[in-house]
Amino acid sequence: RSTLFPYTTLFRSKTLDKIKEAYGGVLFIDEAYSLYSGSQNDFGYEAISTLIKEMEDNRDKLVVIMAGYPDEMERMLSMNAGIRSRVSYTIDFHDYSSEELVEIFTMGAQKQGFVLLEETVAKLGEVFEAAYANRDRHFGNARAARSLFEQTKLQQSNRLALDEEADLFTILPEDIKEL
């Protein structure tokens, strides 16, 4: 027995408690690969072993969704034969297009009462096209659109502080910065 035994037993118990909380619903594990370092002597191995057993024994009570970057997820599934056989479906979600990112930004702005000029929408298209063309595996997708919107509101506030007559709810092209 390892000196970690009491801790791994406690960790297994806490993992099982969390899994049981999801009975009748969905257990969502974001960046699931971060659970497992590849060693059988870590807590992540215990978490995955516990998860595999629950996925098998209680498949009628539990839906498990694991999310993460494709390469890391594939590595995780390859590290444990038991988990691969219990994962029925894998779905690859593609990045949003630049047009979809403009739409996400625009919907968020309109929801908060902002007006975007045609020129502003055109500038958004340019910014998102550049971001999309230069994206890497950490590209933020909808998060990038929301982040740009938050930056834009700050930029717009700075502009409004210098121009008392400007419309408070109109976003101008100069309010949009590069991602």
Q: How would you label these PLM feature ranges?
A:
Residues 15, 30, 51, 64, ...:
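Conserved RecA-like P-loop NTPase ATPase core
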Residues 3-10:
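Short, small-residue-biased leader/transition segments that mark boundaries at the very start
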Residues 11-28, 48-57, 82:
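Conserved alpha-helical scaffold flanking the Walker A/P-loop in AAA+ ATPase domains
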Residues 131-179:
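C-terminal helical "lid" subdomain and adjoining coupling/linker elements of P-loop NTPases
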Residues 33-65, 71-84:
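Conserved catalytic/switch belt of AAA+ P-loop NTPases
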Residues 4, 33-35, 69-74, 95-101:
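Conserved nucleotide-binding/hydrolysis micro-motifs of P-loop NTPases
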Residues 75-78, 84, 93-138, 157-163:
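Conserved C-terminal "switch" segment of AAA+ ATPases
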